Design a protein with these regions (language model features):
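Short alpha-helical catalytic segment bearing the HExxH-like zincin motif
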Residues: 97-105
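Active-site rim/adjacent substrate-binding subdomains
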Residues: 1-97, 109, 115-118
């Protein structure tokens, strides 16, 4: 399933636009990056190396920040377009997968681990 770069980015923007204001406000300093494929370093973060890496949160979750949290680079959520295209067979499925991935990575920002996110459908 192929989607243009613009369509992929619009799908991400739609998920972010649909977030409740109280969550969106907290995410203002989180960068969202889109790239075609994960690199070796990013792939090394996978707990299941047999699957596709759809997204990656890099930063300090809000639950781990202390009063001394300052002067650090912004957190980044990276979404990988190629893996999304490979695991989906329809436009609707692709848009749903993008939504699920964005919300999954935002979950990491809020301190939830993979086990928790997967058990709740993300």
């Amino acid at each position: 399933m192929h989607i243009s770069d613009d369509e992929f980015e619009r799908a991400i923007e739609q998920v972010l636009d649909d977030l409740p204001e109280r969550f969106a406000r907290v995410l203002e300093n989180v960068g969202i990056v889109v790239t075609d494929e994960p690199n070796e370093r990013e792939l090394a973060t996978m707990s299941n190396p047999c699957g596709e890496l759809l997204g990656l949160y890099e930063g300090i979750p809000v639950t781990k920040r202390t009063t001394g949290y300052s002067g650090v680079m912004p957190d980044v959520i990276t979404l990988f377009k190629g893996p999304h295209e490979r695991v989906c067979s329809t436009q609707a499925e692709l848009r749903q997968r993008i939504r699920k991935t964005v919300l999954h990575e935002i979950g990491h920002f809020f301190g939830f681990d993979d086990e928790y996110l997967h058990s709740h459908g993300y």
